Curated annotation (Swiss-Prot):
Top EC class, one word: transferase
Keyword RNA-binding among UniProt keywords: no
Pfam families: DsrE
Keyword tags: Cytoplasm, Transferase
Its biological purpose: Could be part of a sulfur-relay system.
Enzyme Commission identifier(s): 2.8.1.-
Compartment(s) of residence: Cytoplasm
Entry-linked InterPro entries: DsrEFH-like, Sulphur_relay_DsrE/F-like, Sulphur_relay_TusD/DsrE
Homology family: Belongs to the DsrE/TusD family.
Main location: cytoplasm
Name of the protein this chain belongs to: Sulfurtransferase TusD homolog
Gene responsible for this protein: tusD
An annotated Gene Ontology molecular function: sulfurtransferase activity
Active site feature: C81 (cysteine persulfide intermediate)
Length: 131
């Protein structure tokens, strides 16, 4: 069977719901089965997954590091919706500079993108799965 290409859409934050964790586990399973995960688009409260300022307890899985490892190991694009991110205080270095902010908190391996990026994924990937 030919491997399928996927994009995941994550609407839930790291904490408070299981959607982000389930998306991560699904992403790992896809890759283990030989499919290709092209990107993960974080939307609505899901953009909070891209914040570098979360500090989980020592005995908890660090979901941010999990996403970053996935991006590094499998060339997965991690994209936060720029509009949703700015509204929730997740700011890239470029956006911080543009808006005159003293600091930024978008985690390494995450980028900010518009909804056009998600629309492109809808056209190009074999499957888009929302969490």
């Amino acid at each position: 069977m030919k491997p399928l290409t996927y994009t995941l859409v994550v609407n839930g934050p790291q904490y408070g719901t299981q959607s982000a964790r389930n998306a991560y586990l699904f992403a790992k399973a896809l890759i283990e089965k030989g499919h290709i995960l092209k990107s993960v688009f974080f939307y609505q409260d899901g953009v909070l997954n891209g914040s570098s300022t979360h500090v989980p307890a020592n005995d908890e899985f660090n979901l941010l590091q999990g996403w970053q490892s996935l991006a590094q190991s499998h060339q997965v694009q991690l994209e936060t919706c720029v509009a949703a991110a700015l509204r929730r205080g997740v700011v890239s270095e470029q956006e911080a500079s543009q808006h005159g902010l003293a600091s930024h908190n978008l985690a390494a391996h995450f980028t900010q993108a518009g909804l056009g990026s998600l629309a492109q994924a809808l056209l190009e990937q074999d499957r888009v799965v929302q969490f």
